[in-house]
Amino acid sequence: MNDIPAIGSPIRTRTILNEYDLHASKRLGQNFLIDLNVLQEIVQGAAIGPDDTVIEIGPGIGSLTEQLAKAAKQVVAYEIDKKLIPILSETLRPYKNVEIVNRDILKADFSIFAKNQSLKIVANLPYYITTPILFYLLNSSLNFKSVTVMMQKEVAARLQAGVGSKDYGELSLAIQYRVNVEIILPVTRKSFMPSPNVDSAIVQLTPKENFQSFPHEEALFKIIKASFAHRRKSLVNNLLYYFGKNDENRTKIERSISETGFDLNIRGERLTLENYEQLVNNLSENMIFSKE
């Protein structure tokens, strides 16, 4: 194993692609990571250790899988592209702690991980499906310690964005509701083969300690979505679009916003998650809608 270049090295990646006449699938958003420093940064950033079971999403030809296998107790790699399975079986043959599963992660049975005490998720996701996969994982039964993901740089900025910034919005609040977000490392497009049209970033999500769901979660996210429907409009006007424009609704909305402690000209981007939770409570108490 030591005499063979790492799978993620440019020379080994080219050799594998040529040997199997393999071309990156645009339909599946495939780009192969060929920067060993970045691969090792992912493993180190995820703090993978000998007690960890790792779920990897989208192993490709096994570049990241190989580095994970060297550090983890077990790696279960989910690959949706059937033609990559025999390649993965060959490139990862030396690593007996790797299991390759040909399945869409959105259809995976996570019950097999119920007894894992130290579960971590690592992924180099196609950009077009990053957000759906993240929400699927966050809403799943998986008791993970962290999710470490390579994603488009702009999406990473939106996930981490703080109140009042240009990137802050519905996605920021929806993700930060359940987890803490940290950008570990920016990654240039030159680290991939073929090079994508955008730069990337490695992001880590960790569950909030003592997380308790808001009792009226569905109402909360409906209000958040409505509040960012027209970013340049005030919160009052956005909520009027949502509830319906009439004098009674305006009075109740304005009262609810005032009771939250804000000026009536405030925009949705100025409210924190805690502010939105209080706003939902106030809107309900003012009987503009039911939280149930």
From Swiss-Prot:
S-adenosyl-L-methionine binds at N31, L33, G58, E79, D104, N124. It comes from the Bacteria. SUPFAM superfamilies: S-adenosyl-L-methionine-dependent methyltransferases. It catalyses: adenosine(1518)/adenosine(1519) in 16S rRNA + 4 S-adenosyl-L-methionine = N(6)-dimethyladenosine(1518)/N(6)-dimethyladenosine(1519) in 16S rRNA + 4 S-adenosyl-L-homocysteine + 4 H(+). The keyword Methyltransferase applies. It is found in: Cytoplasm. Its main location: cytoplasm. GO terms for molecular function: 16S rRNA (adenine(1518)-N(6)/adenine(1519)-N(6))-dimethyltransferase activity; RNA binding. SMART domains: rADc. Its EC number is 2.1.1.182. Keywords: Cytoplasm, Methyltransferase, RNA-binding, rRNA processing, S-adenosyl-L-methionine, Transferase. It is an enzyme of class 2 (transferase). PROSITE patterns: RRNA_A_DIMETH, SAM_RNA_A_N6_MT. GO terms for cellular component: cytosol. It holds the Pfam family RrnaAD. Specifically dimethylates two adjacent adenosines (A1518 and A1519) in the loop of a conserved hairpin near the 3'-end of 16S rRNA in the 30S particle. May play a critical role in biogenesis of 30S subunits. Belongs to the class I-like SAM-binding methyltransferase superfamily. rRNA adenine N(6)-methyltransferase family. RsmA subfamily. This is Ribosomal RNA small subunit methyltransferase A. It comes from Oenococcus oeni (strain ATCC BAA-331 / PSU-1).
